[in-house]
Amino acid sequence: MARYTGPATRKSRRLKVDLVGGDQAFERRPYPPGQHGRARIKETEYLLQLQEKQKAKFTYGVLERQFRSYYEEANRRPGKTGDNLLQVLECRLDNVVYRAGLARTRRMARQLVSHGHFTVNGKKVNIPSYQVSKWDIIDVKQKSLGTTPFIIAKETIGERPVPAWLQVVPSNLRILVHQRPERAQIDTPVTEQLIVELYSK
């Protein structure tokens, strides 16, 4: 699956939000290069909507075609389209691995999933965009537990809060999905209604 692989800090500075999580370079200088930082640009309604879409896309590592597909799926579901969109993004397997604390970044989580380190309900899944469901059980493969990323994960588990809709068993890094997340449980700094307005035009 295609994805953005360019400099994440540059994107964070352009959109004025840490898209990686714990990006020290962004924290030191949260504005684009240049003596005076980014030139002042009139923020039209369209620009604000576009920025929110870009934030969501780069936060979750999704390109336009797949993002639009997620929006269309969210729009078909009952309830608020914006809430549904964030729920679909949060339920990606790579995001769940990241949220559970088994990877430092979503990029790293995507790589771990792609390399086949996980099973879902006992079956190998190596598709980062795989949608987890309520009651799913995600395990690290036994032979993978002894590799460096998961040794580090065991040592650092709990350093980052795990959302209430997930549970992690520290002894074997098992992830239990108790429910699909509600909007209040998603801390992604995105105003999803602006994305809905953009696609509704």
Swiss-Prot record:
The keyword NADP does not apply. GO terms for cellular component: small ribosomal subunit. PROSITE patterns: RIBOSOMAL_S4 (PS00632), S4 (PS50889). The keyword Glycosyltransferase does not apply. One of its GO terms (biological process) is translation. Pfam families: Ribosomal_S4, S4. InterPro entries: Ribosomal_uS4 (IPR022801), Ribosomal_uS4_bac-type (IPR005709), Ribosomal_uS4_CS (IPR018079), Ribosomal_uS4_N (IPR001912), S4_RNA-bd (IPR002942), S4_RNA-bd_sf (IPR036986). SMART domains: Ribosomal_S4, S4. Keywords: Ribonucleoprotein, Ribosomal protein, RNA-binding, rRNA-binding. One of its GO terms (molecular function) is rRNA binding. It comes from the Bacteria. Residues 91-157 form the S4 RNA-binding domain. One of the primary rRNA binding proteins, it binds directly to 16S rRNA where it nucleates assembly of the body of the 30S subunit. With S5 and S12 plays an important role in translational accuracy. Part of the 30S ribosomal subunit. Contacts protein S5. The interaction surface between S4 and S5 is involved in control of translational fidelity. Belongs to the universal ribosomal protein uS4 family. This is Small ribosomal subunit protein uS4.
